[in-house]
UniProtKB/Swiss-Prot annotation:
Source species taxonomy: Eukaryota, Fungi, Dikarya, Ascomycota, Saccharomycotina
InterPro entries for this protein: G-protein_beta_WD-40_rep, NLE, WD40/YVTN_repeat-like_dom_sf, WD40_repeat_CS, WD40_repeat_dom_sf, WD40_rpt, WDR12/Ytm1
Pfam short name (any one): NLE
Protein name, as recorded: Ribosome biogenesis protein YTM1
Repeat (WD) residue spans along the chain: 101-138, 140-178, 195-232, 270-310, 312-351, 358-398, 409-445
A GO CC term assigned to this protein in UniProt: preribosome, large subunit precursor
Binding partners and assembly: Component of the NOP7 complex, composed of ERB1, NOP7 and YTM1. The complex is held together by ERB1, which interacts with NOP7 via its N-terminal domain and with YTM1 via a high-affinity interaction between the seven-bladed beta-propeller domains of the 2 proteins. The NOP7 complex associates with the 66S pre-ribosome. Interacts (via UBL domain) with MDN1 (via VWFA/MIDAS domain).
Amino acid sequence: MVEDKSQVKVKFFTREQDESLHVLDAPLFAPVSLKRYGLSEIINHLLGLAEPVPFDFLIDGQLLRCSLQDYLTRKGLSSEAVLNVEYTRAVLPPSYLKSFSNEDWVSALDVGAERIVSGSYDGVVRTWNLSGKIEKQYSGHTGAVRAVKFISSTRLVSGGNDRTLRLWKTKNDDVKHVDELEGTEEAHTLAILEGHQAPVVSVDVQGDRILSASYDNSIGFWSTNHKDMTAVDPMDSLGDKASSAAKKRRKLTMKDGSVRRRAPLSLLESHKAPVEQVIFASNDSTVAYSVSQDHTIKTWDLVTSRCVDTKSTSYSLLSMVELPKLRLLACGSSARHITLHDPRADSSAKITQQQLLGHKNFVVALDTCPENEYMLCSASHDGTVKVWDIRSSSSIYTITREDQSVEKGINDKVFAVKWAKGVGIISGGQDKKIQFNKGDNIFKN
């Protein structure tokens, strides 16, 4: 009887598409002392694999991070229970690959076809190839660049502390390479988009439309085609009461008087504090989501430019990403955690579905894994990027800064992170580096 109590009946199953990883679904007894490693040994034995494959395990949709005994105890179950245990291939550690050096803090990143675009505190947008060579530089912003996004293989958009967005042409015979750049700063600006009254800190693109989030509490809605937007007179738009500083800023941006200036299609107003991020809904281009320092998540109808839902939390929200297949929004906060929300839930329903805990400072950027709908990565002012599987409340891996000059709490803040297929997990911050960590083919064979 003592031996029976030290075992529990387990029924293994998997959703892996590779049928060579499927075991018979007959239940068997397993020692309650087993953790992931011991359970992985059982699966490998049942499969008879020549090369062992590490596995992770889930019970009731949650990753197992303790022994079976601890799980039974936490759930108030006896060892007579039958546990349905799902197994899935374990994830490779996001090992360090390389870094690119930038002139100043790296504040924004995006990944396109075989290229990376970065925004920096020196006001310059740069495109890089995957070998680390700067292909082009785009000068024009008069303050830090806070957001960048590829529109297509030939165009991109940026937003910055100078309160403007800029549409750029990335391929143009008139655009010279870095070593020939002098004197061509404005040659490849398609249009300057004006209308915000404070820094522009986030942009998103879907089709021919752009969204921008600003510290003026508003969201800008723009077109990727300058012909769709109303022209702005560069000086008249300032008004007679404009400060001398504002007029000076405007003169600095008027080196090329022929640069088009355009007004937004609309400004979306409802937030009561700076808007930190705005994104298009993945399944509906007429819907957008935003998060703000006013503690709220808002849903917008872009056809009517109206806020149609507001969900209030207890903390400033600083970043957001959608998990499309799960229909959830992950939000990074000033309270150092990541919260998961269902934007479809009724306002009277539970606001927060789940919390991911582990960061020690603001969570300022998020992105999803291109290979797994349950996984995401987060960047924080605590100097780390964390990798998460939302089926566990704690992170799977923590990525630290690799540059030797980094001092904890001095110059280690991470401002931007992207997770892209064929590239990996890339991050940028105060260390003036774009750091690459393995994030492609993440499952062990």
